[in-house]
Amino acid sequence: MKYATGTDNAMTSGISGQTNNSNSASTEMQPTTSTPTAVHKEATPTATTTATYANGNPNPNANPSQSQPSNALFCEQVTTVTNLFEKWNDCERTVVMYALLKRLRYPSLKFLQYSIDSNLTQNLGTSQTNLSSVVIDINANNPVYLQNLLNAYKTFQPCDLLDAMSSSSSDKDSMPCYGSDFQITTSAQCDERKLYARKEDILHEVLNMLPLLKPGNEEAKLIYLTLIPVAVKDTMQQIVPTELVQQIFSYLLIHPAITSEDRRALNIWLRHLEDHIQAAAAGLTNRSYFLQPSPQLVAGGSSTGSGSCSSSATSSSTASCSSVASSSLCPASGSRSSRTNDWQTIAPPSKQLQNKLAGDWRGSGGGSSSGSINPLCDNLNGITLNELASSQNSLGLSLEGSSSLVNGVVAGAGSMLGIGGGDDHDTSFSKNGTEILDFDPVTADMGEACSLASSSLCGRNGGNPVEDRSQPPPNLQQQMLQPPPYASILMGNVGDQFGEINRWSLDSKIAALKTRRSNSLTTQTISSCSSSSNSSVITVNDNCSNSTENLAQFANKPRSFSLSIEHQRGALINSGSDTRLDEFKPNYIKFHTRNVGMSGIGLWLKSLRLHKYIELFKNMTYEEMLLITEDFLQSVGVTKGASHKLALCIEKLKERANILNRVEQELLTGQMELSTAVEELTNIVLTPMKPLESPGPPEENIGLRFLKVIDIVTNTLQQDPYAAQDDETLGVLMWILDRSIHNEAFMNHASQLKDLKFKLSKMKISMVPKMHHVKPAGVGPNNGNINKPRWNGKTRKCDPKNGSNDRINNRKNSNDMLNFSLNCLPHPLPHHSQQPPPPLPQFDYNGYGGGPSHQPQYKSSSYPSFMGNPQQQPPPPPPTKSHHHAQQMQQMLQQHNHFPALPQQTPPQSHRRSLNNLILVAGGPQQPQQLIFKPGQGVLTNNGSSDNLGLERNQQPQQQQRKLSGGVTSAEQQPKKTMAAVVMENLAKFDQHFTLF
């Protein structure tokens, strides 16, 4: 059934709630509703059931006659779409069906595939029809027959035409040529009109065969592509109808046999065709033979589409596009084939065909095909541009309000692929920086190829427009390095209408007008052919100074990921996502190429921040890339700064062999540090390199020299104990190895590089972190925290209050020596943040306890211990009795009570590191002894006596009494002479003796 695809929800999305307009659209098409009426009756039960189920009734046996607005609306929609479908020609139907198929899910597509196969098998018709279809299918893929058609089309005289047919047939014997509906007449009396008719017949023949072209038939495809420039030139001379060429272009845009490179080769001619149609619609040609606007349209009405313009804003997008466009630019010739009469049906409308805009070049020429594109016409049956294509302007037509699209299926196919028309469609359709693709990337490439095909407005041939210099060479990829000659066949034979106007200036203004910074985040394709096509615009016109105009050929250029100074602020006005510096994804700039050594060109350009010019190198070989000059880059539209930078970088690529040779020699002789060599490798690893196995002289094998330097650096790091091994050098070297593993030049050596990277990773893990002091576990209050930095003695504070240069221990408690009596208390003090230490190491005079430290520069356990030196140890003190110590402590505490608390009286401070301090040693009648030690000496003796427990119990009442005394410290209550008693108390409590100095 013809409306099978209409059951998709996309068909009903664009015209909900517009019953009256749909009725009016159906009433307008009564002459063609005989067949659709039956189809409508047949479709009513199914439509009713579907709508009923959608409304919440799951019963499939619902009454079909039940009146519901949704059911009636769907039936009217089916009728409207069916009527429109019946009015379209074969090419228009194909384009619309292609657009609708992109909206279906996989099960629906498979169902349609089975249905199409069954229909092709059962409904081929009679044997005569079957034979005719087979013959057309064979001829469509026969290069000999297609070459005969091409020769016949390019021949002007009938006799030459016949000779060309016979000679080419005798030379080729690969495949037999079958007959078709194309016949050549040998009458010598053929006038110009009959010659035009023969050319038109040839185009009809090509139009019938082009959909049957099989993918993979490169020879036949090249003949089809070769016909395009000649047909476009004949269209500009008004020899053949414009609609035929538009239909051929529309098939080429969506044909699976046409690659992106082929579509880019068509960009010049598609843009020429568009400008010719616009000029013809504006009345600039000598005779408006095919595109004369109808009087009804100028008057504001049309016999076939009087309600189209009014319904375009409310009815189905397909119906509005078709009906409005069918009344916008109708062919005036009535003798044309019926399949070309309605060719303009799905073109977007032009509401103001006769407006003149002073700022537009078309307005200066005498007329303007002005019209703002109807937003609903940018939808195809409810399929918005956002749903059908990527967010970028996929035909590159950044159309202002004064321009219009190609009035044909080229525009229809472009709308299907996401043509933006007007300022509403220049904004980004991405959501949070994510592209929305409703179809496969192949179609996206096709849409971009269409955009690139419509991005060039310059004429191609100069001088005589009849001269055939427009045919592309057999190898289409060779056009990139040679900018083709340009001429002014843009207007065909109507150049005299422009008078004194400089065509080059006009072309550059057109290119600048249609160039808008792409809002897309994708970086898929840029036209290398279109880059070449605008070289004359850039070199001839001096007004094209800014980057927006110089990049006219990059109408669909990828979004730059850097807001560099090359892009002026004016180019960022309408950018929806340029302010977001997204994370660059390397897969966006990778492309598959058959040229050896060029697969990594994208990463190299990204490192230079010139990745938007990646498509210039897509079809280049490695040798061609090294021959690029700054003049060539500017000729293809690269800005002056970028071309200069890129040319300098290419010159540096030629010096890589000398740089690697120098690095290798200096590493072997020890004249270069490893960090310098690693830096040189970093600059080279991202550059394009040929594989090691590529033929050529060894001195030019950059990859081999690169691996030699890598081997020398890694061997030095692993084997040389004097090599500077640090985290930074190892990290950069591992990054270089990671990039080398994925480099095309080292694909056959990836396993060796992985092993080398693994060895370096183990070496990096085994390295000790820099600037961190390692302590054994259990030493110090932090229990040997390995991450604690060592204190540098040079950066520590000094003691300025006593005029001494000795450094102060940087601890929380930095009081003088008289605080010992306070710190002798066993209870934890409030200013201590550590956990209560065990009893024995509570007073640690090595600088880790709460008291003052008298050995700060030797607090680390990494310094040598003097325990094993018996010559420097004084004799151990004799053991004391517990009752003797208790009596001494009672006497000292009684002395403390005779001195009242005087907070304002501070005893004179003595230098706590002075060597003249008296240190009392336990034992005997407790006479003070003066011990003078040299720095670096220490005394540590152990005594197994542990009879100080009774003394601790006697201290508990005194400690509580001291807490209640008002918080006055013992240092403020005792004179300096009690120092001996304090030291004796410490020695009586503990068994370790430390020498303080």
UniProtKB/Swiss-Prot annotation:
Compositional bias per record (Polar residues), positions renumbered to this chain: 1-37, 802-822, 854-864
Question: At what positions is Phosphoserine found?
Answer: 564, 575, 970
What range(s) does the SAM domain occupy? 600-654
One GO MF term, please? translation repressor activity
Q: Sorted alphabetically, which keywords does the UniProt record give?
A: Cytoplasm, Developmental protein, Phosphoprotein, Repressor, RNA-binding, Translation regulation
The ranges of region (Interaction with cup) come to 583-763
Tell whether Cytoplasm is among the UniProt keywords. yes
- State whether it acts alone or in a complex, and with which partners, per the record: Interacts with oskar (osk). Binds to the 3'-UTR of nos. Interacts with cup, which in turn recruits eIF4-E, leading to an indirect interaction between smg and eIF4-E that prevents mRNA translation.
The identity of this protein, by name, is Protein Smaug
Species of origin? Drosophila erecta (Fruit fly)
What does the organism's lineage look like at the top?
A: Eukaryota, Metazoa, Ecdysozoa, Arthropoda, Hexapoda
